[in-house]
From Swiss-Prot:
Record's protein name: Small ribosomal subunit protein uS3
UniProt cross-references to NCBIfam families, sorted A to Z: rpsC_bact (TIGR01009)
GO cellular component entries: cytosolic small ribosomal subunit
Ranges where the record places region Disordered: 216-242
Source organism phylogeny: Bacteria, Bacillati, Cyanobacteriota, Cyanophyceae, Synechococcales
Function: Binds the lower part of the 30S subunit head. Binds mRNA in the 70S ribosome, positioning it for translation.
Organism of derivation: Synechococcus sp. (strain CC9605)
Basic and acidic residues composition bias: residue spans: 233-242
InterPro entries: KH_dom (IPR004087), KH_dom-like_a/b (IPR015946), KH_dom_type_2 (IPR004044), KH_sf_prok-type (IPR009019), Ribosomal_S3_C_sf (IPR036419), Ribosomal_uS3_bac-typ (IPR005704), Ribosomal_uS3_C (IPR001351), Ribosomal_uS3_CS (IPR018280)
GO molecular function annotation: mRNA binding; rRNA binding; structural constituent of ribosome
HAMAP family, alphabetized: Ribosomal_uS3_B (MF_01309_B)
């Protein structure tokens, strides 16, 4: 089951958060969902060179909050924040409401080579430049290992190296526990357009296990806490009273 289902959808509410955080009535829900999709497509199309990893959307009354996780925040912000104003007007034009309040928050990705979407984007760019897929995968694995990820799995499907018959190739380094729900797994897909057709790319990145406060691992060298001895209960025999 863990190998078939989308790892992000399986872990929503456990280790993953929803990309859209808002509530709506059944009447307005489809329109708002399509609006979120248009916003994400607009951002990825217009700012493809900014290395945008994720787009989080929240709604509060008439205010729309958009959080962008990017590897190059300077490309989005621009000089003196001019890029933010351009992005805000572009979002308002996309949703068809120029009076809507749009709040934009730009967050820089700390480990670029440890992000699944940015790794998939790097692989797609190399394949579109006609670099051999085995070398591309090897370089991506090396970059992820330098970023300190615990496990990585990469899968590429299609007419690899221009072969007549499409096939699927994959590689794995380290641990990628897809069946463990507490495992923090970053998953992303990307399509590379080549002269021989399209190639599908999937990337799984294992970043560690998310443990609750009650299940935190014991520090190295610390002695286990002994359970206090339970005092035996004492009962009084009052059957002969009264």
């Amino acid at each position: 089951m863990g190998h078939k289902i989308n790892p992000t959808g399986l872990r929503l509410g456990i280790t993953q958060e929803h990309r859209s955080r808002w509530y709506a009535s059944s009447k307005n829900y489809p329109a708002l969902l399509q609006e979120d999709d248009r916003i994400r497509k607009f951002i990825h199309k217009k700012y493809g060179s900014a290395g945008i990893s994720d787009v989080l959307i929240a709604r509060k009354a008439d205010q729309l909050e958009v959080e962008l996780k990017t590897a190059r925040p300077g490309v989005l912000v621009g000089r003196q924040g001019s890029g933010i104003e351009e992005l805000r007007s572009g979002i308002q034009k996309t949703i068809g409401d120029s009076s809507r309040q749009v709040r934009i928050n730009v967050v820089e990705v700390e480990r670029v080579d440890g992000d699944a979407f940015l790794l998939a984007e790097y692989i797609a760019q190399q394949l579109e430049k006609r670099v051999a897929f085995r070398r591309t995968i090897r370089m991506a694995v090396q970059r992820a290992q330098r970023a300190g990820v615990l496990g990585l799995k990469i899968q590429v499907s299609g007419r690899l190296n221009g072969a007549e018959i499409a096939r699927t190739e994959w590689t794995r380094e380290g641990r990628v526990p897809l069946h463990t729900l507490r495992a923090d797994i970053d998953y992303a897909t990307k399509v590379a357009s080549t002269t021989y057709g399209v190639l599908g790319i999937k990337v799984w990145v294992f970043k560690g296990e998310v443990l609750s406060e009650q299940a935190q691992p014991m520090p190295v060298g610390a002695a286990p806490r002994r359970r206090a001895s339970r005092r035996p209960q004492q009962f009084e025999d009052r059957s002969n009273e009264g």
